[in-house]
Amino acid sequence: MDIRLGNGFDVHAFGPGDHVTLCGVKIPHGQGLVGHSDADVAMHTVTDAIYGALAMGDIGQHFPPSDPQWKGAASDIFLKHAVAQASEQGFEINNVDCTLICEFPKIGPHAQAMREAMARIMGMALSRISVKATTSERLGFTGRGEGIACIATAALVRA
């Protein structure tokens, strides 16, 4: 049985705005996230985890931030590409575990909608998508409220 695990990590700083987009869900907040695309740190991290499991590098290799066509792009484009690559190589994504690290906004009230959005985008059962959050106990840049970090793991199984 061919099982692959991939890990992803990403960070985005807070900047001007009135919401953040996480897992494709708009969450009201006094600031936005800064990035070349829509700065969906969670979706970027899951995308990188899938590319990692496939040994295909990272999101920046497939969608370079130096390429103006990706300016402001919706991150589901990137995630759908990674999911398609897995399928083309004969893999099914067994499950995804995504952990957001931030003091705010509070993720709990939005976690179910985030899971549902990711399941829809990835074409997976909701029971195979985990989205959760923790804080850094007010340490580091996330603890100071300067941005959001995210880690994710994706498990792929040869179909």
Swiss-Prot record:
EC number: 4.6.1.12
Catalytic activity: 4-CDP-2-C-methyl-D-erythritol 2-phosphate = 2-C-methyl-D-erythritol 2,4-cyclic diphosphate + CMP
Site note Transition state stabilizer, residues: H36, T135
An example Gene Ontology molecular-function term: 2-C-methyl-D-erythritol 2,4-cyclodiphosphate synthase activity
Pathway: Isoprenoid biosynthesis; isopentenyl diphosphate biosynthesis via DXP pathway; isopentenyl diphosphate from 1-deoxy-D-xylulose 5-phosphate: step 4/6
Amino-acid positions noted as binding a divalent metal cation in the UniProt annotation, renumbered to this chain: D10, H12, H44
Alphabetical UniProt keywords: Isoprene biosynthesis, Lyase, Metal-binding
Domain of life: Bacteria
Signal peptide start and end residues: none
Function as written in the Swiss-Prot or TrEMBL entry: Involved in the biosynthesis of isopentenyl diphosphate (IPP) and dimethylallyl diphosphate (DMAPP), two major building blocks of isoprenoid compounds. Catalyzes the conversion of 4-diphosphocytidyl-2-C-methyl-D-erythritol 2-phosphate (CDP-ME2P) to 2-C-methyl-D-erythritol 2,4-cyclodiphosphate (ME-CPP) with a corresponding release of cytidine 5-monophosphate (CMP).
Alphabetical list of NCBIfam families matching this protein: ispF (TIGR00151)
The protein's name in its UniProt record: 2-C-methyl-D-erythritol 2,4-cyclodiphosphate synthase
Organism this protein belongs to: Roseobacter denitrificans (strain ATCC 33942 / OCh 114)
Gene of this entry: ispF
